[in-house]
């Protein structure tokens, strides 16, 4: 079986390389030296349009129970492997979106399947404890093997959560408690504070604020939603807070041609940040913290320079604001470093950092001074899931053993180079190509063309994602290799050549 599979892959690789050399070929990508992911498929295999008939039937059934309009198609996860997602109609697609950037090392990784089959791990998957009061014996050990082994600089404290929204929500609460504790000093809670907090009034509920950026996405819970400014549909009809919103830089591309303009744009945004901090202090809505993504993701894959973030960090420190870096989507290795903020080169990059998605669990790291001063202040029933810490420990081992951070940088370079070639060939469809590692994207002329390209690509066997008003984003797994990039680029080149 193994030898037959290897032969099939070699044949596929030969055919793939051969067609790139055919005179007059409109494919732009060069064949890469193929480094196989052992549990991967050879390529896409399409049997129906997507969604196919089985998916459509299941969508109808689900729509009876809930609004299912967001569902793209139903999946067969038993058959999905590596970089390939298989749907219930038997269509096999190269997945460059990976469950909204949340699959770290591919579908059905053999090491993870082996892990869950080991008898000593069974109880961890069957029994989900309330970690805040009844953690299992090996909880600390597993945290050390998983999350604490990749802790950011200067952050020794860790609280686990279940998802990105609850990670950010509780991180915001932690910041507010830290700030009020600074103001309160050594004294305990006053009777007035204890009474007024119960009726949502000051001084028990101080009127602090969090500064966020236009285009940001930090989650859908109430506090997070007040800092989210990417799509109106996320926020409409929901009461919110009067918190400051700063502009995020809108860089011009190619970067090397617009150095001065981009520096001026970043300076403008930083000046506005400082102005808002002062303005809200005068309004008696003191800015307790600043929250920012290293790359704005849902809002359109908006980048800023490393220098912008270094200066933003300085502003937070100058004004006594906590600095919260949201690594929910950028964390876990996709930019070529485990945490995207590592690219900034700071010894003190943040006070608090949130994570989820590729980390398989949620939570946040923070400095010692942000540690809650009493139990139950940051708390919920589960506080994450220890089975996810078990899986994450193995994921981190694989990332290190297979050098997947360097792979993300290398494969990302292949992808970005190919996208730039496509941009040169089809400037009427592709602009503002940008990326860090495999965390790449480009703009289309409008959302109609963007959505049409995503649908065509899906029916050709490639899953892509949209973001912002008109961008297409790439969020492949960490086992995405150069040859996957070239495979996609050839498929997408065909699509653009025929696009009308």
UniProtKB/Swiss-Prot annotation:
UniProt main location, coarse: mitochondrion
Q: Which GO terms describe its molecular function?
A: (S)-3-amino-2-methylpropionate transaminase activity; 4-aminobutyrate:2-oxoglutarate transaminase activity; identical protein binding; iron-sulfur cluster binding; metal ion binding; pyridoxal phosphate binding; succinate-semialdehyde dehydrogenase binding
Keyword tags = Acetylation, Aminotransferase, Disease variant, Disulfide bond, Iron, Iron-sulfur, Metal-binding, Mitochondrion, Neurotransmitter degradation, Pyridoxal phosphate, Transferase, Transit peptide
Q: In which tissues is it expressed?
A: Liver > pancreas > brain > kidney > heart > placenta.
Functionally, this protein is described as follows: Catalyzes the conversion of gamma-aminobutyrate and L-beta-aminoisobutyrate to succinate semialdehyde and methylmalonate semialdehyde, respectively. Can also convert delta-aminovalerate and beta-alanine.
Q: Which disease is it linked to?
A: GABA-transaminase deficiency: An enzymatic deficiency resulting in psychomotor retardation, hypotonia, hyperreflexia, lethargy, refractory seizures, and EEG abnormalities. GABATD inheritance is autosomal recessive.
What's this protein's family per the entry?
Belongs to the class-III pyridoxal-phosphate-dependent aminotransferase family.
Q: What is this protein called?
A: 4-aminobutyrate aminotransferase, mitochondrial
Q: Which organism is it from?
A: Homo sapiens (Human)
Q: Which gene encodes it?
A: ABAT
């Amino acid at each position: 079986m193994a030898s037959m599979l290897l032969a099939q892959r070699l044949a596929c690789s030969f055919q793939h390389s051969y067609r790139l050399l055919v005179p007059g070929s409109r494919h732009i990508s060069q064949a890469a030296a193929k480094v196989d992911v052992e549990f991967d498929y050879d390529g896409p295999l399409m049997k129906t349009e997507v969604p196919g008939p089985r998916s459509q039937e299941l969508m109808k059934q689900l729509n009876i129970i809930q609004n299912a309009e967001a569902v793209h198609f139903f999946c067969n996860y038993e058959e999905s492997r590596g970089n390939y997602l298989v749907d219930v109609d038997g269509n096999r697609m190269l997945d460059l979106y990976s469950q909204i950037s949340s699959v770290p090392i591919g579908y059905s990784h053999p090491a993870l399947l082996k892990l869950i089959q080991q008898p000593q791990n069974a109880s961890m998957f069957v029994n989900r404890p309330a970690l805040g009061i009844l953690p299992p014996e090996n909880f600390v050990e597993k945290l050390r093997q998983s999350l604490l082994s990749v802790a950011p600089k200067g952050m020794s404290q860790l609280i686990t959560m279940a998802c990105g929204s609850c990670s950010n929500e509780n991180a915001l609460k932690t910041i507010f408690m830290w700030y009020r504790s600074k103001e309160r000093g050594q004294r305990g809670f006053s009777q007035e504070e204890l009474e007024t907090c119960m009726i949502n009034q000051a001084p028990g509920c101080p009127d602090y604020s969090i500064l966020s950026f236009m285009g940001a996405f930090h989650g859908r819970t109430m506090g997070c939603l007040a800092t989210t400014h990417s799509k109106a549909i996320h926020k409409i009809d929901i009461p919110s807070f009067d918190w400051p919103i700063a502009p995020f830089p809108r860089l011009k591309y190619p970067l090397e041609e617009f150095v001065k303009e981009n520096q001026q744009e970043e300076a403008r945004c930083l000046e506005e940040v400082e102005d808002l901090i002062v303005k809200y202090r005068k309004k008696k809505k003191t800015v307790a913290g600043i929250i920012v993504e290293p790359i704005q993701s849902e809002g359109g894959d908006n980048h800023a320079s490393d220098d912008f973030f270094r200066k933003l960090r300085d502003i937070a420190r100058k004004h006594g604001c906590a600095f919260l870096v949201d690594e929910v989507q950028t964390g876990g290795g996709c930019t070529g470093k485990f945490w995207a903020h590592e690219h900034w080169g700071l010894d003190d990059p943040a006070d608090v950092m949130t994570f989820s998605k590729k980390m398989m669990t949620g939570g946040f790291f923070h400095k010692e001074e942000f540690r809650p001063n009493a139990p139950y202040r940051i708390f919920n029933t589960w506080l994450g899931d220890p089975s996810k810490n078990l899986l994450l420990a193995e994921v981190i081992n694989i990332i290190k053993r297979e050098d997947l951070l360097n792979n993300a940088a290398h494969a990302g370079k292949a992808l970005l180079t190919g996208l730039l070639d496509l941009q040169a060939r089809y400037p009427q469809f592709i602009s503002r190509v940008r990326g860090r590692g495999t965390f790449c994207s480009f703009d289309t002329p409008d959302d109609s063309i963007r959505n049409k390209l995503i649908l065509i690509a899906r029916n050709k066997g490639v899953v892509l994602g949209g973001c912002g008003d008109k961008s297409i984003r790439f969020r492949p797994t960490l086992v995405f290799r150069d040859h996957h990039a070239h495979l996609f680029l050839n498929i997408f080149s065909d699509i653009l050549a025929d696009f009308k």
